[in-house]
UniProtKB/Swiss-Prot annotation:
KW Glycoprotein (keyword) present: no
Name of protein: Probable chemoreceptor glutamine deamidase CheD
InterPro entries: CheD-like_sf (IPR038592), Chemorcpt_Glu_NH3ase_CheD (IPR005659), Cytotoxic_necrot_fac-like_cat (IPR011324)
UniProt xrefs under CDD domains: CheD
Example GO biological process: chemotaxis
This protein's encoding gene: cheD
Organism listed in the record: Nitrosomonas eutropha (strain DSM 101675 / C91 / Nm57)
Length: 194
């Protein structure tokens, strides 16, 4: 059975001349192939984790640090960092990565919407990913977290290479609209007691 949270938006990136997959919020992807994993981040965070020896890597894209239902059980949804990090690491290991060879690069966590500055969702996501990786003893080799700008991210899992572009000037509100849309979607799909 295919996991619906496994990214499936494949395309050929002509600028980079390589097969690619675009990750949306709540998705993850693991591969052994030579390709690029791409996403755009606002307050969300992506962890790019790879095995430096076997060259197996993957990325997630989560919206909120973690969540539990009213019974205290974690919600199994990759929109939440706790689940997104766990499933990414499990899939890497299942595909042949070794825990002791895993390293990470982390990005995002920007407080890009004026309303998010007070709730600091981006900062909460950034703190969460750093704490999670420290607890699992996966070193962070590089990253770009927090701030006020969205980011466009390209991760090459076989080499660990990252291309990052901060989107400093945005004359449209596409990212803010997406953040609001995914926040509403998240609230509508997480029901108390589930």
């Amino acid at each position: 059975m295919v996991d619906p949270q496994f990214a499936s938006n494949f395309y050929f990136d002509q600028r980079l001349n390589i097969d690619a997959v675009k990750l949306l919020p709540g998705e993850y992807f693991v591969t052994t192939r030579e390709m690029v994993l791409s996403t755009v981040l606002g307050s969300c965070v992506s962890a790019c984790i790879y095995d430096q020896q076997s060259r197996i890597g993957g990325m997630n894209h989560f919206m909120l640090p973690s969540s539990e239902n009213s019974s205290g059980f974690p919600i199994e949804c990759a929109r939440f960092g706790g689940y997104a990090m766990g499933i990414l690491i499990r899939e890497l290991l299942k595909n042949g990565a070794r825990k002791q060879n895993l390293v990470a690069k982390v990005f995002g966590g920007g407080n890009v919407q004026p309303a998010m500055v007070t709730s600091a969702i981006g900062s909460q996501n950034a703190r969460f990913v750093k704490k999670y990786l420290a607890e699992y003893e996966i070193p962070i080799l590089a990253g770009d977290l927090e701030g006020f700008y969205p980011r466009k991210l390209h991760f090459f899992p076989k080499s660990g290479r990252v291309l990052l572009k901060k989107l400093h000037v945005s004359h449209n509100d596409t990212i803010a609209k997406r953040e609001k849309h995914y926040s509403r979607l998240l609230l509508s799909t997480v029901k108390p007691g589930i």
